[in-house]
């Protein structure tokens, strides 16, 4: 008899040892884990490699954004919105400025509405490019991140050209947008890395206006999405890691208040851009991609299809904006600042400018809820005014908070390695979760 068999028989014959049970153990996942997507801390109860329970701990990025917004004039809180979901900046701004416009009873000019629609979709593509690259990286497909950031860099240049900032744009304003689209795109300058033919190639398409640049981008982007799909969609390893992993049924998705790709991946066709149109979404043509199985693979397919639909919307907006010049800010000077030229010649205009940006404006008493279809789901802003120049109450509805609440119900029964895939498809950003 082998030594192993003898040891096993001795263990089984010991009445004390045989009564002992194998107990589950606890594992801390994050907040320093590279796949935690920020500061997610999961306390996992494990039975071997199988997850028995998952407790998400949040609050490590709490900055008191709602209370900060309540301490500032209405027009000074727009930059705070950029720093919530810091991958979907202008969509956050859109919800906030729409809430102010609703209380004040004003509407942005038509050209500003088209610009907002276009930049919402540029933001959606930027978000999904970041997501597809980082999610693939989490699961071991490293090349996709390099491909995705190639196009994302071009859209970052568009952000910078229109607002001066690559991320925190603060471009939307109550009553319109900060300024009209620029007549030129920034170009790369000669350096030790870029010169000669390579420099000329990088600056191709940047000689004209921003709309010319975006028109060229929309013509080439579908082929770039095909490249991402070549790397992932039929990849055997990718499908093994995502198919039938993290299945969320339609009933479960509704029960947890899911929105965006998380909800549409489960087969529910709900999109605020179609169901409750805002800006100019009722004037553009696009489809709502939905999944069938509700697993990680379906959520991936939904986001890839959304990039194609966003590209369609941008193309339509560019066509309209080229043909229809006009104002991008309301003429209500209670909300809109005077021109820079006017301030230099007119003392009243200078006083008006100073008062507007130091004290702001009083918003009529009332309350409203404004929501937009952000890349991650429904991002909403509940705004209450008591008639002063500062909000009485600001509450922000972050899609990631509702999605993270379902983590325990979704990951139970899956392996530890599958948790990384599921967290990736949640597309969490803790700036908005913790607020």
Swiss-Prot record:
Membrane topology value: Peripheral membrane protein
Transmembrane segments: none
Cited PROSITE patterns: COMPLEX1_49K
Enzyme Commission code: 7.1.1.-
SUPFAM superfamilies, sorted: HydB/Nqo4-like
Location(s) in or outside the cell: Cell inner membrane
Class of this enzyme: translocase
InterPro entries assigned: NADH_Q_OxRdtase_suD, NADH_UbQ_OxRdtase_49kDa_CS, NDH1_su_D/H, NiFe-Hase_large
Alphabetically ordered keywords of this record: Cell inner membrane, Cell membrane, Membrane, NAD, Quinone, Translocase, Transport, Ubiquinone
Catalytic reaction(s) noted: a quinone + NADH + 5 H(+)(in) = a quinol + NAD(+) + 4 H(+)(out)
Major localization class: membrane
UniProt GO molecular function: NAD binding; NADH:ubiquinone reductase (non-electrogenic) activity; quinone binding
GO cellular component, one term: plasma membrane
Residues making up the signal peptide according to the UniProt record: none
Role: NDH-1 shuttles electrons from NADH, via FMN and iron-sulfur (Fe-S) centers, to quinones in the respiratory chain. The immediate electron acceptor for the enzyme in this species is believed to be ubiquinone. Couples the redox reaction to proton translocation (for every two electrons transferred, four hydrogen ions are translocated across the cytoplasmic membrane), and thus conserves the redox energy in a proton gradient.
Subunit structure: NDH-1 is composed of 14 different subunits. Subunits NuoB, C, D, E, F, and G constitute the peripheral sector of the complex.
PANTHER family the UniProt entry points to: NADH DEHYDROGENASE [UBIQUINONE] IRON-SULFUR PROTEIN 2, MITOCHONDRIAL (PTHR11993:SF10), NADH-UBIQUINONE OXIDOREDUCTASE 49 KDA SUBUNIT (PTHR11993)
HAMAP family per the UniProt record, alphabetical: NDH1_NuoD (MF_01358)
Family of the protein in this entry: Belongs to the complex I 49 kDa subunit family.
Protein name: NADH-quinone oxidoreductase subunit D
Organism: Xanthomonas axonopodis pv. citri (strain 306)
Gene that encodes the chain: nuoD
């Amino acid at each position: 008899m082998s030594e192993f068999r003898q040891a096993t028989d001795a263990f089984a014959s010991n009445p004390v040892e045989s009564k002992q049970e194998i107990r589950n153990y606890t594992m801390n996942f994050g907040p320093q884990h590279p796949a935690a997507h920020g500061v997610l801390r999961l306390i996992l109860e494990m039975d071997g490699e199988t997850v028995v329970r998952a407790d998400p701990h949040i609050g490590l990025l709490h900055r008191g954004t709602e209370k900060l917004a309540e301490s500032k004039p209405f027009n000074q809180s727009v930059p705070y919105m950029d720093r919530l979901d810091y991958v979907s900046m202008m969509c956050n701004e859109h919800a906030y400025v729409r809430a102010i416009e609703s209380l004040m009873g004003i509407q942005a000019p038509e050209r500003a509405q088209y610009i907002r629609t276009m930049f919402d979709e540029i933001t959606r593509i930027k978000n999904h490019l970041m997501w597809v690259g980082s999610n693939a990286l989490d699961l071991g497909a490293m090349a996709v991140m390099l491909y995705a950031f190639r196009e994302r860099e071009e859209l970052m240049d568009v952000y910078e050209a229109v607002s001066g900032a690559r991320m925190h744009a603060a471009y939307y304003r109550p009553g319109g947008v900060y300024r009209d689209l620029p007549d030129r795109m920034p170009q790369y300058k000669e350096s030790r890395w870029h010169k000669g033919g390579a420099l000329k190639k990088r600056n191709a398409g940047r000689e004209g206006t921003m709309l010319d640049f975006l028109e060229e981008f929309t013509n080439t982007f579908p082929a770039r999405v095909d490249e991402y799909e070549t790397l992932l969609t039929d990849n055997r390893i990718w499908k093994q890691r995502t198919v039938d992993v993290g299945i969320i049924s339609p009933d479960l998705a509704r029960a947890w208040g899911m929105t965006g790709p998380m909800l549409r991946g489960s087969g529910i066709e709900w999109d605020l851009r179609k169901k409750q149109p805002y800006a100019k979404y009722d004037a553009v043509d696009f489809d709502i991609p939905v999944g069938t199985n509700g697993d990680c693979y379906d959520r991936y397919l939904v986001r890839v299809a959304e990039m194609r639909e966003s590209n369609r919307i941008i193309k339509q907006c560019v066509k309209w904006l080229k043909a229809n010049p006009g104002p991008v800010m309301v003429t209500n000077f209670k909300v809109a600042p005077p021109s820079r030229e006017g301030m230099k010649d007119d003392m009243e205009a200078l006083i008006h400018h100073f008062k507007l940006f130091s004290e702001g404006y009083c918003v009529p008493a009332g309350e409203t809820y404004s929501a937009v279809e952000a890349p991650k789901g429904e991002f909403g802003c509940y705004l209450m005014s008591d008639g002063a120049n500062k909000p009485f109450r600001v509450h922000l509805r972050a899609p990631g908070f509702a999605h993270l609440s379902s983590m325990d119900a979704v990951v139970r029964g899956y392996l530890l390695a599958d948790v990384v895939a599921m967290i990736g498809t949640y597309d969490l950003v803790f700036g908005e979760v913790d607020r």
